[in-house]
């Protein structure tokens, strides 16, 4: 049985990755400091090590048990916070990742799937965004992710080290079977905030800008279901274990959904009216961010199963009313 270490495996995306790996009969160990990850997201079938990526000794001790691959999802990810406290993000994201890679090299673990982000691209210069799009992150968070990609690229040239950087677009939804119940704390993303309005936890949603060059005037984004993200991680591990090559791959649906379309979807699924208010544009918000997933299909043999926004919203609502 092939063994995978999932660093950050108690978090929102990480727990779905663990679930997908267990379903494919991998032996899984989760390494998480539970700063944002939650114990309720842990699976009894997976071993758990409570640890921080700053702890080089524990990382190396854990990896010395022998793993075929690492999935690295541990990171600080609040864009605003990264601009206010770049030193925290440099220390945690960049230095912490180097700690992981050094532990891999020192223990002979040769493959890593890295949780990167569409934020490395910055303002789109053309659409849909592909992997050759210019890199120009507009936040320190996005910068840290690209720096980590560059470190991996150099390690792959200098050491016996393979990587797949998966550049996520907007992750949404929850496990369709309801097996993962831990909600993200202090949500920053659109759908969880709309759900807080739907459940009465928040009075209203602010829609930033209705004068964009889009069909309804609100921003368009590419929303990808978290189970589709998880299945791509499994496909990436299998690809590296069989071919021993490195890749950088977008994970997206190639479909744009506007803010108003998301609100309307939640209203259809929940049967509840969403209270929202138009507000001025936020500085730096692009009107449209949509990516092609052609390369993911070609390299990983992967394509998203969730392409209907109502189906995605329903998996989130099912958790709210559980």
What are these regions (language model features)?
Residues 1-174:
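N-terminal Rossmann-like NAD(P)+-binding domain of SDR-like oxidoreductases, especially those catalyzing
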Residues 8, 49, 72, 79, ...:
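Short, flexible active-site loop motifs that bind/organize anionic cofactors or intermediates
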Residues 12, 139, 167, 185, ...:
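Amphipathic alpha-helical recognition patches that constitute DNA-binding helices
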Residues 39, 169-190, 200-221:
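Short, flexible, glycine-rich and Lys/Arg-enriched loop motifs at helix boundaries
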Residues 126, 137-144, 183-190, 222-226:
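The catalytic Tyr-centered alpha-helix of NAD(P)H-dependent dehydrogenases
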Residues 193, 199-322:
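C-terminal substrate-binding subdomain of Rossmann-fold SDR/epimerase-dehydratase oxidoreductases
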């Amino acid at each position: 049985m092939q063994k995978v270490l999932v660093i950050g495996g108690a978090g929102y995306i990480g727990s779905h990755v663990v679930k997908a790996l267990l379903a494919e009969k991998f032996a899984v160990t989760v390494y998480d400091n539970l700063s944002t990850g939650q114990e309720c997201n842990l699976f009894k079938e997976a071993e758990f090590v409570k640890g921080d990526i700053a702890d080089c000794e524990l990382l190396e001790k854990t990896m010395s048990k022998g793993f075929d691959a690492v999935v690295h999802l541990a990171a600080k990810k609040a864009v605003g916070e990264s601009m206010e406290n770049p030193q925290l993000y440099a220390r945690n994201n960049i230095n912490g990742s180097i700690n992981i890679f050094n532990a891999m090299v020192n223990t002979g673990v040769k493959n890593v799937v890295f949780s990167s982000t569409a934020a490395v691209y910055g303002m789109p210069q053309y659409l849909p965004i592909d992997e050759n799009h210019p890199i120009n992150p507009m936040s320190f968070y996005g910068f840290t992710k690209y720096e980590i990609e560059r470190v991996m690229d150099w390690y792959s040239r200098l050491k016996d080290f393979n990587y797949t950087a998966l550049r996520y677009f907007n992750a949404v939804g929850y496990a369709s079977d309801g097996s993962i119940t831990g909600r993200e704390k202090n949500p920053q993303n659109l759908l969880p905030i709309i759900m807080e309005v739907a459940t009465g936890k928040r009075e209203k949603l602010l829609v930033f800008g209705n004068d964009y060059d889009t069909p309804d005037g609100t921003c368009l984004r590419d929303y990808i279901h978290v189970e589709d993200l998880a299945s791509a991680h499994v496909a990436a591990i299998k690809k590296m274990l069989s071919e021993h090559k490195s890749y950088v791959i977008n994970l997206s649906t190639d479909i744009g959904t506007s803010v108003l379309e998301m609100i309307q979807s939640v209203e259809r699924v929940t049967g509840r009216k969403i209270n929202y208010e138009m507000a001025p544009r936020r500085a730096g918000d692009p009107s449209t961010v949509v990516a092609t997933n052609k390369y993911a299909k070609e390299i990983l043999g992967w394509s998203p199963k969730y392409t209907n926004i109502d189906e995605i919203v329903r998996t989130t609502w099912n958790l709210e009313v559980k």
